[in-house]
Regions:
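Active-site bordering "gate/hinge" segments
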Residues: 1-324, 329-332, 426-428, 442, ...
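Dual-mode signal for accessory low-complexity, basic/Gly-rich regions
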Residues: 239, 275-493
Length: 493
């Protein structure tokens, strides 16, 4: 939250920018003043190996002139520099017109004057560095108590972010937001018989304060994590070249959702804006409303209002309020992730509010919001608890956590690993496996889900390292979901 004097100064600069943009005859313009504070701690074995605590500030000006975008940014927040950046953005827009194929048009948005602050109980930056470092070293010390049994490495981390943003537009919006983010976890590695295997645990990346760093929970999982790493290093390798039933915990499934549902439904990607870098999408607009993306009992919902969600905000970087909507409803592709530009091109009347820029020096683009798998309804014919899925499986594999992954340029054909694997036989877990991967075609995979967990097993998992764009931008989002069971999935090579 900006101080009163700083806010007034920033508002005065914003007013100056908007006046200049209007005077230049632009169809649209906006300005973002941003301050980011990032604090990261890493501990390796018995020492603190990495500590950063830095802050950066600046502003970015975006103009739309005769259907072409122009953008300029600077860290110097003075009237003189602001005037220079507005003029530069206008000149860039004029240059952009020279290679423009079709003019950019935007769907309308109301003007908002509002303030949004992430609800937190404890400011993470109010906690002394020493206390945070001691927590990490305590975790590592306890993991390394299993050194005689074979634990050789311990790593732990804490990460905190605070983002202050003031947005103003030629449409009359003036929005101030303060976002807090917290994240923690650890990993240990066991070594035996010429092999090394790891297990990990995390408090997932969420928009919360230091209250999210539940020390009791973090410390209570240490024994289990260490023992599973030791069991895993001695475990047999997983099967290869077969088909199997998979039961995926939310800690594994969220990444599959991210890669095979999130990215394919980014409308800028569908339209080819990413084709020279990350690729395109199989989920083309001619299939909207007809593509059988998943089984009829599968619903994928976006929700930027989700409490504590990593992508939860008040407004996106175009001043569009947060909202919720389905991208897949009863298995059918029904919508996309849009900003104001792509929504207009699709013929929609409004944006879904997915515009995000990771810095004052970055252009907003369509990013995945909080996007999750809805739980199965109570009493539903395909609803089952994790325990019921296991008990009802004659032979299969249970997967927890994330590992290696790959997916093709159209998000059609993928391969995923995991962090923990257990063999299931006759409805019981009989032991761990290691080095398991599964691969499938996206729509085949989601149509072969025959059981989904209830709301009581819904879990918020997600990522804080989603890369997109050139230059590369990093975004974060939550993929809350429940366990699922999937039939006839290819395992290994």
């Amino acid at each position: 939250m900006l101080t009163t004097s700083t806010r007034q100064k920033t508002c005065d600069l914003a007013t100056l920018a908007i006046d200049l943009i209007d005077q230049a005859g632009c169809e649209y313009g906006d300005i973002r003043f941003c301050t980011y504070r990032n604090q990261t701690l890493h501990a390796h074995d018995h020492s603190l190996s990495h500590l950063t605590d830095h802050q950066k500030s600046g502003f970015g000006v975006r103009v739309l002139l005769k259907g072409a975008w122009g953008f300029a940014a600077s860290y110097r927040q003075t009237p003189e520099e602001l005037i220079r950046m507005v003029n530069l953005a206008i000149e860039i827009a004029k240059g952009s017109r020279l290679c423009q194929q079709n003019p950019v048009r935007l769907v309308p948005v109301k003007a908002y004057q509002d303030t949004y602050i992430t609800p937190i109980k404890i400011d993470p930056f109010s906690i002394p560095i020493s206390e945070k470092a001691n927590l990490l070293l305590t975790i590592n010390d306890r993991l390394l108590q299993y050194q005689e049994q074979g634990i050789r490495k311990a790593n732990s981390y804490l990460q905190f972010n605070q983002e202050n943003k003031l947005f103003a537009s030629t449409e009359g919006s003036l929005i101030e937001q303060t976002i807090y983010r917290s994240y923690s976890g650890y990993r240990c590695t066991a070594v035996a018989n010429g092999d090394a295997q790891s297990r990990s645990y995390e408090r997932p990346p969420l928009n919360l304060g230091y209250e999210h760093i539940d020390q009791t929970d973090l410390l209570s999982q240490i024994e289990r994590v260490a023992e599973e790493a030791l069991e895993k290093v001695y475990a047999p390798k997983g099967p290869s070249g077969i088909q199997s039933t998979l039961i995926l915990k939310p800690t594994n499934l969220y990444l599959t959702i991210h890669e095979s549902v999130g990215h394919p439904t980014e409308l800028d990607r569908v339209y080819g804006y990413e084709s020279n870098f990350a690729g395109t999408s199989f989920a083309t607009t001619d299939q909207l409303g007809t593509l059988q993306y998943a089984a009829p009992w599968i619903n994928f919902k976006c929700d930027r209002t989700q409490p504590a969600g990593r992508s939860t905000i008040g407004y996106d970087d175009e001043g569009v309020p947060s909202q919720e909507w389905y991208v897949v409803k009863e298995g059918i592709l029904v919508d996309y992730l849009t900003d104001r530009e792509t929504a207009y091109r699709l013929g929609k009347s409004s944006s879904k509010g997915c515009a995000f820029a990771d810095s004052w020096s970055s252009l907003p683009m369509v990013r995945i919001p909080n996007l999750g798998l809805e739980p199965g309804p109570i009493g539903g014919s395909h609803t089952a608890t994790l325990a019921e899925m296991i008990a009802d499986t004659k032979e299969g594999i249970l997967i927890d956590g994330i590992g290696s992954f790959s997916i093709d340029q159209q998000r059609r054909n993928f391969q995923f690993g995991g962090d923990g694997f257990w063999q299931i036989k006759n409805g019981k877990i009989v032991g761990m496996l290691k080095d398991v991967t599964y691969h499938a075609m996206t729509t085949d995979f989601w149509n072969q889900v025959d059981a989904i967990g209830p709301a009581s097993e819904w879990q918020q998992c997600g990522t804080n390292m989603c890369g997109k764009g050139e230059p590369l931008q990093i975004a974060q989002m939550t993929h809350a979901c429940v366990p699922v069971r999937v039939q006839n999935i290819n395992i290994g090579g």
